[in-house]
A protein has these predicted regions:
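Membrane transport/envelope proteins' first extracytoplasmic loop
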Residues: 3-224
C-alpha cells in the first residue's frame, strides 16, 4: 500500500520527485560499492578456485619403470606448468602376506593424496624408504614399524598411518618419491620378477589447454 502512496505523492509534487533523485543515486552507488567489495573479498578457498579453475590435470606418459630404476626424463619445462608431482603406482609383495598390496609413490602430502587419504597417526614420509600404510595393512603385519618388500628383502620404515577415504579396508602403501628407485635390484632381476610401476604426472597449469597440446606433441598422449 505504501508503494501506491509514494507513487501518488511523486506524481502530485515535482519537488518530491526531485528530492527522490539524490536518494536513488545514493542507493545506486551503495549497491555498486557493495558488489565490488563482495567480488574482491574472496575466501581463501574461493581465491584458489578462481586462480586454478580447471587447470589441474594428469598426464600418462605411457612409461613403465622397473624397480631399482630411475623414472624417465620428460620435457616438463616446455609444458609451462606451475607445479608437477610425479606419481608411480603398482602392486607389490609384502613379506608375510599372501596377497599383493597397492603401492603408490609421490611427494606427500600432495594433490594425489588430497581428499583420498587422511593422516591418522605419525607423519608423512620425508625421505626415500619412508612410508605410510593403511590400518588394515599395519594390522596384517602385526603392528610393526618395518615392512619388507620381496624380492630383495627391501626394508621400508613405517612413519605413519593413513585412512583411505573410499576403501577403508584396503591394504595400501604410500611411499616418498625415490623409494622405488632405491629398491636393491638390478634391471635384470626386476624384469624377471615383473616388478614395474606405471608412471604418471600430476600437474598444475594456468593454461591447461596449451599444456595438454604440448604434452600430446611431446609424448603422443592426451591429458587425463
Amino acid at each position: 500500500m505504501w508503494v501506491w502512496n509514494l507513487a501518488a505523492l511523486m506524481l502530485r509534487s515535482r519537488k518530491s520527485w526531485l528530492r527522490m533523485v539524490p536518494m536513488a543515486v545514493a542507493l545506486l552507488i551503495m549497491t555498486v560499492s557493495l558488489g565490488v567489495n563482495r567480488s574482491i573479498n574472496l575466501s581463501p578457498e574461493q581465491s584458489v578456485t578462481s586462480t586454478l579453475g580447471a587447470a589441474d590435470g594428469l598426464v600418462s606418459p605411457g612409461f613403465s619403470v622397473l624397480a631399482g630404476s630411475s623414472s624417465p626424463t620428460v620435457p616438463i619445462n616446455r609444458w609451462k606448468v606451475r607445479q608437477i608431482n610425479p606419481y608411480l603406482e603398482t602392486q607389490v609383495s609384502v613379506k608375510g602376506l599372501p596377497e599383493e598390496v597397492l603401492y603408490q609413490e609421490s611427494s606427500m602430502p600432495g594433490i594425489n593424496t588430497k581428499g583420498r587419504y587422511a593422516l591418522i597417526s605419525g607423519k608423512w614420509p620425508t625421505k626415500p624408504s619412508e612410508i605410510v600404510v593403511t590400518p588394515s595393512l599395519r594390522q596384517g603385519i602385526g603392528g610393526k614399524n618395518k615392512l619388507v618388500l620381496e624380492p630383495g628383502n627391501y626394508d621400508l620404515t613405517i612413519v605413519g598411518t593413513v585412512g583411505a577415504t573410499f576403501d577403508k579396508s584396503s591394504r595400501e602403501i604410500l611411499a616418498r618419491s625415490g623409494t622405488w628407485q632405491a629398491w636393491p635390484l638390478t634391471q635384470k632381476q626386476a624384469k624377471i620378477s615383473g616388478l614395474s610401476g606405471n608412471y604418471l604426472i600430476f600437474f598444475t597449469s594456468s593454461d591447461s589447454a596449451g599444456t595438454c597440446s604440448k604434452v600430446n606433441d611431446d609424448l603422443g598422449s592426451d591429458c587425463l
